[in-house]
């Protein structure tokens, strides 16, 4: 088997994780107590869904996942929620005091005490796998736990499981809405680790997803649950081909191979279509061409950044439901003729498509309508540099005055780390700039490590 272990860190990671496992269970017909009436091979782990669930002899299906937080309240909701019987108590790890939105607390003082316990639990899950293919890591970089403990854990995973791929689903701070004043510091420090220790990072941002909920689902005041269910659909689409047998299956490492032209250029934009509310669904039957066009709309992007301002380097389209390759080819051909969708000159083809015949499932009583077919797009575009330059700008404004820095230094961090991380991000922005420029004159090798100051 090619198993995948999911690691959910901090409030954002745990809440997105909740939404994901809720959806996986519905998709596979697994009950909240872990039993699966439709599973004929009890205790035998050779079904496709066993990449994400392990099975006990009694026929209980247990997610291959760990939930970690430095304070208990959010994970306690899992411990007492609908799916409390699904998880083994050891998979839910909490500390006693939180990281207080401080990267240094998550990475040095408090995170350091809990990280070995986390790694032990992950090791137990890994030992239970026959052919572990990688990790999915869910966190946000604005707070303290997701950024600090997340970075620490990724560093340690690189040491322990060097060759396994690590995909990050990372919530980045939004341009207008902030939950903490020190978000820019935490984000810059954490991205420094994401750059080195993840193979692919999919960037999400709450504001962009709020807008999608408001615009497409007519939810006036979206809650985190609304947001997370939408994120769960994206993640479910990406992992569908690992969990179901399909026509064009896509492996975790395949994302990496097809989307990452240079090791550092691995921050992805994602979008999902169709996002329609149950009321509207009765009147619209969306064709493959329509949902494909909709996935390329700037308004569908799950991070606030406009792909029209950049060029695409590569793009993955994951279809699910009633879709045939012929329609996909036609839709992609149409996209290629559009002037607004530009590819870099050194990547003329740039499309990888996957098709999975399992139609999208929706959470009963949720906001999304049940549809026949859906598509999720992950793209590597130079426009994502907008997200970094926005955060860097905010970082510079605060750091010029050394505002709030004492909280970080007081937790045992050195001030030099700030400037080191900031320089790394400046180099990253420069890399993106170089990758997007015409490459006739060079030999196409720039952008590999260009822009080190």
Swiss-Prot record:
Source organism per UniProt: Naegleria gruberi
Record's comment on post-translational modification: Acetylation of alpha chains at Lys-40 stabilizes microtubules and affects affinity and processivity of microtubule motors. This modification has a role in multiple cellular functions, ranging from cell motility, cell cycle progression or cell differentiation to intracellular trafficking and signaling.
Keywords tagged on the record: Acetylation, Cytoplasm, Cytoskeleton, GTP-binding, Hydrolase, Magnesium, Metal-binding, Microtubule, Nucleotide-binding
Keyword Calcium: no
Binding positions (Mg(2+)): 71
Binding site for GTP: 11, 71, 140, 144-145, 179, 206, 228
Subcellular location: Cytoplasm, Cytoskeleton
InterPro entries: Alpha_tubulin, Tub_FtsZ_C, Tubulin, Tubulin/FtsZ-like_C, Tubulin/FtsZ_2-layer-sand-dom, Tubulin/FtsZ_GTPase_sf, Tubulin_C, Tubulin_CS
GO molecular function: GTP binding; hydrolase activity; metal ion binding; structural constituent of cytoskeleton
PANTHER family: TUBULIN
Chief subcellular location: cytoplasm
N6-acetyllysine modifications at: 40
Superkingdom of origin: Eukaryota
Gene: TBA1
Catalytic residue list: 254
Residue numbers spanned by region Disordered: 429-453
GO BP terms, alphabetized: microtubule-based process
Record family assignment: Belongs to the tubulin family.
Protein name as it appears in the record: Tubulin alpha-1/2/3 chain
GO cellular component entries: cytoplasm; microtubule
Compositionally biased tracts (Acidic residues): 431-453
Keyword field contains Nucleotide-binding: yes
Known EC number: 3.6.5.-
Reaction catalyzed: GTP + H2O = GDP + phosphate + H(+)
Subunit and partners: Dimer of alpha and beta chains. A typical microtubule is a hollow water-filled tube with an outer diameter of 25 nm and an inner diameter of 15 nM. Alpha-beta heterodimers associate head-to-tail to form protofilaments running lengthwise along the microtubule wall with the beta-tubulin subunit facing the microtubule plus end conferring a structural polarity. Microtubules usually have 13 protofilaments but different protofilament numbers can be found in some organisms and specialized cells.
Cofactor(s) listed: Mg(2+)
Pfam families assigned: Tubulin (PF00091), Tubulin_C (PF03953)
Record's function text: Tubulin is the major constituent of microtubules, a cylinder consisting of laterally associated linear protofilaments composed of alpha- and beta-tubulin heterodimers. Microtubules grow by the addition of GTP-tubulin dimers to the microtubule end, where a stabilizing cap forms. Below the cap, tubulin dimers are in GDP-bound state, owing to GTPase activity of alpha-tubulin.
